[in-house]
Amino acid sequence: MDYYFTKGKPQLVNMKTPIYLVTQFQQLMDLMQNQYEVSCLELMQRSGKAACDFLVYRWPKVKKISIFCGRGDNGGQGYVLAQQAKKMGMIPTVWQVGHQMSMSKPPQMHKEVWYEMNSCHQQGIVLHTYSPDIDLGDPELIVDALFGVGLYGHVRPEIALLLQRLQQFTVPILAIEVPTGINASTGEIAGNALAATATITFLCMKLGLLINDGKIYSGEIAFDDLLAPEEIYQQVKGIEESSLLDSSTCFSKKIWYRNKTQKGWQLSIN
């Protein structure tokens, strides 16, 4: 059953979203950029702001947040979230994993990520280079913006140690796109993974969040369509194999939705 929350009171609605593999998600991203002319930077900003909106909606009393950013696009989403969080009165601290602040774009970093990293710096947001022996303080919430769907192969040993360290905190963990260490298509663990309290994913629902270990590690799921036109989901079809979602791998789960026709979040108990 699907519910729309108005002043805390649930009302029944009908809301569904297509489910995709990572390769299909990448096709959707290509269409958004090339056919619908939404830039990579704009998509990054929409997703980072949506993540912050959900954070505030789900945990309205949180003030001190720690955002762990990788050097890829997922990290860029984390940088956008940090800026939005500061505008909304929170105290964001960014932990840079595998990179550090630079006045010139590092060779392996996309220009959009570098732009958002520098925007954080210009706005006075504290940027720390992560190291295993550094004190992480006492955040009220942790944001996982390390890899998203961009993880290939197994989690490196140094990242596995970081995930173990973060898992020891007793505060909520919000993962952006996919919890680090979870394969977004298969739901399998890539050696080690971070169990999130909630995961916000964009443009389409990733199959790996709904099956196998991914269904456990993703926690509650929030979905935002990034203002994508409805036609895009006809151009790239979602999965059709019902066996991928059989009863042996799936169980009841909270899923929050928001699309371009809604201002609030809808809760579905699947």
Swiss-Prot record:
Disulfide bonds: none annotated. Binds 1 potassium ion per subunit. This is NAD(P)H-hydrate epimerase. Its cofactor is K(+). SUPFAM superfamilies: YjeF N-terminal domain-like. Catalyzes the epimerization of the S- and R-forms of NAD(P)HX, a damaged form of NAD(P)H that is a result of enzymatic or heat-dependent hydration. This is a prerequisite for the S-specific NAD(P)H-hydrate dehydratase to allow the repair of both epimers of NAD(P)HX. (6S)-NADPHX binds at D73, N74, G75, G76, Q77, G148, V149, G150, L151, Y152, G153, H154, E177. InterPro entries: YjeF_N_dom, YjeF_N_dom_sf. Pfam families: YjeF_N (PF03853). Its EC number is 5.1.99.6. It catalyses: (6R)-NADHX = (6S)-NADHX; (6R)-NADPHX = (6S)-NADPHX. The lineage of its organism: Bacteria, Pseudomonadati, Pseudomonadota, Gammaproteobacteria, Legionellales. PROSITE patterns: YJEF_N (PS51385). Belongs to the NnrE/AIBP family. Residues 25-234 form the YjeF N-terminal domain. It comes from the Bacteria. Keywords: Isomerase, Metal-binding, NAD, NADP, Nucleotide-binding, Potassium. It comes from Legionella pneumophila (strain Paris). K(+) binds at N74, D144, T180. GO terms for molecular function: metal ion binding; NAD(P)HX epimerase activity; nucleotide binding.
